[in-house]
């Protein structure tokens, strides 16, 4: 049956065809069949299928199956969740235990090494409690505040990569330590081993000490066998056995009293009633330190006696102040290369009767000791009196006669001497010497006499003295401590003025000196006045510093001093040939008539030139100074003791401090000793010195808390470091241009030849730079780098460089702007403080931080001697440094960095007069 029905004739009737739906898109769409329904009519179907091999369609099938880039999974991946408070099970370990660490490794080195595995939260390096060295154990905890899982992962990575790694020559042992128990257990074991070793060393040291002690005792016993009988201690006195150490410390001869017996050095039974210093026997070996060594060591202090026994040496004192001064000065000093430690002992029942003088010890001594002490006192007084008489009667006049030759007497002096001798007949005045036995020997003092004839020289001198007295009255406005000190000085000067014989032309009065002064007067020489000071004055001048002793001028006298070549009328009156007058009225009657005759004769005598030199007081120019020496005294315990001189000052001090609350200090002596010892240990002042505030020299930084130690660690700015560090002092730039015509380099000779030939006129500026650059490569400038006063290192010229010469090329890596930004961040992260980046244009930068030449050491200056230029050489841009002016040998090379202005300022340390203060 024909499938095509179009060939049928139209006359035949239409028949219904049988059909079957082969494909219905509504039931399922197939891309190769489309979206139309496919029918089969009258059972006609498609042609039969032909079987074909699909492998034949692929021409490269024989080569094999192509490999895919994605690997096959051997197993399914497990999902990891971050550990939090809702997680089950224990927390993963976030800390590691590191052992077998070198003792030379510090905690900062370990932190820097383990920081590469993760953020380190805590690092505990175990130390030896006895020596402070490292035990080689460390516990490191990673930061788990942000994420516990990240910290645990960092700990695992640290164990994997750091375990077995050699660090400072030793392989590290790194394990996970969840709760730190491994570290604690290892630390206990190491500590037990250290303690065991320490105990062994202590026992060994004690054994050696016992052996040394036994050998020393044997040596002492052997030495004691050779001591003669007269040096052996007496049986009835408080002595020790023959094996004691006191015999070896005594030498047989004393410098003053001859032989030294054991009874003189035995410690008395009532030693606790003495003020003494004890030197323990441990510090003075008997074979090295002797009795004379101790006596020589304490020779500068007024001790009473030195005793000794098996406990050591006892040095007794009569004065608490002398004992305390000796303790402060000689404690922890050396005697025969042995360091001694003094123990201070005071009388328990000692009371203060005076503000400055300690109470006198009243004890009953045995007859032998009392006799020996009295004998020593008498001998000491006789020696002092003999020395004083020799000085005053023999040495003093001889020295004065040798130093002061007799001047030629003037006409006035001759007339006065002749008239006075003819009108008065008085016998010689015997010299009267009155002195106390207890005085210390001292040389006499020489003072100039006051001449009454100079008191009325001119009206100008009177006006000047009135102004001086008026200025003295203005001193009442000074501080209280200065007024107290001035009052004491005034009383001292008045006491000294009482010792001189003052003869005034107005009332002709004679003031007698105090007891203890020796006055020697001669008629043929200038009149000297010898004044022997007392014990109190000697002590006063000894305790006061030389710079603080000032003498106030006698306010009643207009002229204080006269020279030795002037009139000697007063000396004639007080000559040794004069008799002692009966009363003051007799002196006045006898002196009035010769004075009238002298005035009549002098009116006829020729006029002699009178010396107008006046030595009255001090010279004042303008206003008085504001600061006084007492203003610099630190008002602590030493300062108050320095200002308070006598009982009157002490009463003023009590009145000034009466409103202050009282403090419970128990023993005042021990309290004062603690304060002074603390001050001495801190190194503020030495014992015996006054507490004067030191003047700051050079750089000085004031601390708000009072001490730099109490302010902790803080960063000192670079500008402040440049004020006191020697290599950071601000350099002084000499801005004066040094014009020199010297031609020292080969380049200058070449330029001169070109200039003479007219070559320079035809060269363009760029070509001239190129020629100079080629010459620079042929002959480089002599430069070197070294410590700079501007900033760390700098570049210096080793030869003279003329203006406009090429100095050096700035060489480095040429990078882009983006790379430069990343490198700058990396440099900061790595701890490189300085980066050497030089910009050529907007996107090209030269980096000389790690690769370059010494041109990177050129520092910035606001008044530079060089400039930087960018030139083209063979199509490439290069940075070249030119000399902006003549540069001398040894001068540092600088140029202006020209940083853009920013909010974060960088201080400039160039030190130039035109310095802007900041680089940006």
From Swiss-Prot:
EC number(s) from the headed UniProt entry: 2.1.1.354
Residue ranges constituting the SET domain according to the UniProt record: 781-898
Residue spans of biased composition, Basic and acidic residues class: 205-216
Record domain RRM: where: 94-179
EC class (word): transferase
CC terms in the record's Gene Ontology section: chromatin; cytoplasm; Set1C/COMPASS complex
Amino acid composition bias (Polar residues), ranges on this chain: 233-242, 453-462
Motif (RxxxRR motif): 749-754
Positions annotated to bind S-adenosyl-L-methionine: 897
Bias kind Basic residues: ranges: 463-476
Pfam families in UniProt: N-SET, RRM_1, SET, SET_assoc
Keywords: Chromatin regulator, Chromosome, Methyltransferase, Nucleus, RNA-binding, S-adenosyl-L-methionine, Transferase
Location(s), subcellular: Nucleus; Chromosome
Region (Disordered): 205-242, 448-485
UniProt note: domains: A construct containing set1 C-terminal fragment of 692-920 is able to form H3K4me.
Assembly notes: Component of the Set1C/COMPASS complex composed of ash2, sdc1, set1, shg1, spp1, swd1, swd2 and swd3.
UniProt-recorded name of the protein: Histone-lysine N-methyltransferase, H3 lysine-4 specific
Name of the gene: set1
């Amino acid at each position: 049956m024909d499938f095509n029905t179009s060939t049928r004739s139209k006359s035949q009737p239409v028949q219904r065809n049988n059909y079957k739906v082969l494909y219905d898109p509504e039931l399922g769409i197939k891309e190769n069949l489309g979206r139309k329904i496919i029918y089969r009519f009258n059972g006609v179907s498609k042609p039969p299928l032909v079987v074909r091999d699909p492998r034949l369609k692929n021409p490269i099938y024989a080569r094999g199956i192509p490999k895919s880039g994605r690997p096959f999974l051997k197993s399914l991946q497990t999902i990891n969740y971050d550990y939090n408070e809702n997680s089950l099970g224990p927390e993963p370990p976030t800390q590691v235990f590191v052992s077998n660490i070198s003792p030379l490794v510090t905690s900062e080195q370990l932190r820097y090494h383990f920081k590469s595995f993760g953020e380190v939260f805590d690092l505990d390096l175990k130390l030896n409690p006895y020596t402070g060295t490292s035990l080689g154990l460390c516990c490191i905890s990673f930061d788990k505040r942000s994420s516990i899982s990240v910290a645990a992962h960092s700990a695992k990575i640290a164990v994997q990569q750091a375990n077995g790694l050699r660090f400072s020559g030793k392989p590290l042992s790194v394990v996970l330590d969840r709760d730190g128990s491994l570290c604690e257990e290892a630390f206990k074991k190491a500590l037990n081993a250290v303690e065991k070793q320490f105990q062994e060393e202590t026992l060994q040291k004690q054994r050696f000490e016992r052996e040394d002690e036994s050998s020393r005792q044997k040596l002492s016993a052997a030495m004691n066998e050779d001591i003669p009988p007269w040096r052996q201690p007496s049986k009835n006195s408080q002595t020790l056995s023959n094996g004691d150490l006191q015999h070896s410390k005594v030498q047989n001869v004393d410098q003053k009293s001859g032989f030294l017996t054991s009874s003189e050095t035995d410690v008395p039974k009532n030693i606790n009633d003495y003020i003494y210093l004890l030197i323990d026997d441990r510090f003075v070996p008997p074979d090295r330190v002797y009795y004379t060594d101790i006596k020589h060591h304490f020779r500068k202090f007024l001790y009473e006696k030195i005793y000794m026994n098996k406990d050591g040496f006892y040095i007794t004192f009569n004065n608490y102040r002398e004992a305390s001064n000796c303790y402060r000065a000689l404690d922890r000093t050396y005697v025969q290369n042995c360091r001694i430690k003094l123990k201070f002992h005071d009388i328990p029942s000692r009371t203060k009767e005076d503000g400055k003088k300690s109470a006198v010890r009243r004890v009953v001594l045995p007859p032998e000791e009392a006799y020996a002490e009295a004998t020593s006192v008498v001998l000491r007084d006789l020696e002092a009196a003999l020395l004083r008489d020799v000085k005053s009667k023999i040495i003093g006049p001889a020295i004065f006669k040798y130093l002061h030759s007799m001047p030629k007497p003037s006409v006035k002096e001759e007339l006065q001497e002749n008239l006075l001798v003819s009108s008065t007949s008085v016998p010689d005045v015997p010299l009267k010497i009155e002195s106390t036995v207890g005085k210390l020997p001292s040389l006499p003092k020489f003072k100039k006499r006051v001449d009454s004839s100079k008191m009325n020289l001119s009206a100008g001198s009177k006006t000047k003295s009135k102004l001086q007295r008026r200025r003295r009255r203005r001193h009442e406005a000074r501080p209280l401590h200065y007024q107290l000190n001035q009052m004491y000085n005034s009383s001292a000067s008045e006491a000294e003025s009482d010792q001189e014989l003052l003869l005034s032309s107005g009332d002709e009065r004679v003031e007698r000196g105090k007891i203890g002064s020796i006055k020697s007067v001669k008629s043929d020489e200038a009149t000297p006045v010898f004044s022997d000071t007392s014990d109190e004055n000697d002590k006063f001048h000894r305790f006061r510093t030389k710079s603080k002793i000032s003498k106030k001028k006698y306010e009643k006298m207009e002229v204080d001093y006269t020279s030795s070549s002037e009139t000697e009328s007063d000396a004639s009156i007080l000559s040794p040939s004069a008799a002692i007058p009966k009363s003051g009225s007799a002196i006045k009657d006898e002196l009035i008539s010769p004075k009238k005759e002298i005035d009549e004769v002098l009116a006829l005598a020729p006029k002699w030139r009178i010396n107008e030199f006046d030595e009255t007081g001090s010279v004042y120019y303008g206003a008085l100074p504001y600061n006084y020496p007492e203003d610099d005294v630190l008002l602590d315990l030493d300062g108050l003791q320095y200002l308070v001189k006598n009982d009157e000052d002490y009463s003023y001090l009590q009145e000034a401090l009466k409103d202050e609350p009282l403090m419970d200090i128990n023993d005042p002596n021990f309290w004062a000793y603690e304060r002074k010892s603390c001050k001495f240990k801190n190194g503020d002042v030495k014992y015996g010195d006054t507490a004067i505030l030191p003047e700051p020299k050079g750089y000085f930084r004031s601390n708000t808390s009072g001490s730099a130690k109490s302010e902790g660690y803080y960063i000192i700015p670079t500008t402040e470091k440049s004020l006191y560090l020697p290599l950071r002092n601000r350099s002084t730039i000499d801005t004066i241009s040094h014009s020199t015509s010297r031609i020292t380099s080969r380049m200058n000779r070449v330029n001169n030849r070109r200039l003479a030939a007219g070559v320079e006129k035809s060269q363009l500026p760029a070509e001239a730079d190129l020629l100079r650059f080629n010459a620079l490569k042929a002959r480089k400038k002599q430069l070197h780098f070294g410590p700079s006063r501007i900033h760390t290192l700098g570049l210096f010229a080793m030869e003279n460089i003329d203006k406009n010469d090429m100095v050096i090329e700035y060489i480095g890596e040429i990078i882009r702007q983006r790379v430069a930004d990343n490198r700058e961040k990396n440099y900061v992260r790595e701890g490189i403080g300085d980066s050497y980046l030089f910009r050529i244009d907007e996107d090209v930068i030269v980096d000389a931080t790690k690769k370059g030449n010494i041109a990177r050491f050129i520092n910035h200056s606001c008044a530079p001697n060089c400039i930087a230029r960018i030139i083209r050489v063979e199509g490439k841009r290069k940075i070249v440094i030119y000399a902006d002016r003549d540069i001398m040998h040894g001068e540092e090379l600088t140029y202006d960095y020209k940083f853009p202005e920013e909010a974060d300022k960088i201080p400039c340390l160039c030190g130039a007069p035109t310095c802007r203060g900041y680089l940006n």
